[in-house]
């Protein structure tokens, strides 16, 4: 999902932002002949994510940096684990330290939070999915992290899937008119999702042939009734008031996917350290 050229372009921008016109500390203290060795260690349990991005930081800074990882993306790591060994020119290691950690800590944090939500759902068929509430220009990395943590992905951007919300319904005149107009104007390859907050809207969405029906902020009993109405005629998405405590109860209503911005927006960074 993350191509090498996409990673490299993004990392170059991050390094440019952080190094600026030069690392005045490192460049005035370290000689070109100075080499360092270090370890990437974890100070807490979690799911590792972002290895290739971490490597890309140092690949850009120097061809002489060597990194050996002992885990792969998606692996569970425990407090005290040595994740990787790294060695190379001191200038490259010191200038890349913060940027490399920013990526791998953030991505591992999201993967870890996603994994917690999927575990909370239990053996139910539902999958936790992300939303478009992401960090600007970091969405691809955050979505990759969700996938790595065991979640599924919602639309990447506005061109992936048509999603009809309340404002669109008001604009079109009715839910039915909105779906019918989209069916006429968009590609057959695009699915249409409708956001519903009442059972009447659910019935209308089923009758007009919506591909995906989102149950927005519905009480559990209403959600169960909505799933009975839909009865396999559309993919059922639950959204709103999703927490680690409520995820299983929502899943047991019979929905197919549970969307939550929390797995990205509220995910804490994973405490990883580069010890040299």
List each language-model region with its residue ranges.
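Acidic/glycine-rich phosphate/pyrophosphate-binding loops and surrounding catalytic core
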Residues: 2-197, 201-208, 212, 224-229, ...
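Glycine-rich beta-strand-to-loop/alpha-helix junction loops that act as flexible
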Residues: 215-216, 236-242, 260-262
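Short, charged, intrinsically disordered terminal tails
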Residues: 262-276
